[in-house]
Amino acid sequence: MRFSLLPDPRFRKHFSALTDRLDKAARLITRETFSDFADDLMTTVLEDGFAAAGADEGTLWLVNTARRELDAVFNNGPMVNKMRELSQTLDRGLISMVFSTGQPFCENDIEQNPEHDKTVDRQIGSPTTAMIAVPFYFAQECRGIVSCVHLAKQPGSAPTQRAFDMESMREVSRAASLLTRLFDFKLISRIIGYGHN
């Protein structure tokens, strides 16, 4: 037997108001409020996705429309505090390209790509050698990027990770999709006063 659940016409008249409220609620999730909004399940989904992709570390970037940039709001690397202070402008670099096109991106020799903006690499003092970036949607819009990287290894450190492949990108895309559902559920639950979210 198929599961079938049709929209309830009684709620249709409230759809526009709910959509508007959802957009306003989504804009409240910023670098300053992310740690209060996010729960362990959300951050675990990201960490598991980065690990499954074979990344050295990963970052969730959320758009800051007022400043026209992407702000790092979550990172699971060794320099998490420094990373969460960083931003990337929306007018250059591959992460901004993914945000504007809505298309995922994967490259293993990224340091050779002239479109790669090395600003973050310089700020953390560790060159990126490979990157996956996928758009992150919630509240019906692309509002950020989920990215993960391989970093250049220092002499004498552990061997380089395997190259990113299509399975790596699927893992990061899956994590972003799960995170979308968690964000949307939490926002809608808070708006309608449902549950303990």
Question: Each predicted region: which residue ranges?
Answer:
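A short, aliphatic-rich beta-strand micro-motif
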Residues: 129-137
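GAF sensory/regulatory domain recognition
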Residues: 47, 59-83, 151
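Sensory-domain boundary capping and coupling elements
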Residues: 95, 136-156
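Acidic/proline- and glycine-rich, intrinsically disordered low-complexity segments
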Residues: 81-105
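Signal-transducing coupling segments at domain and membrane junctions
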Residues: 80-81, 108-130, 155-161
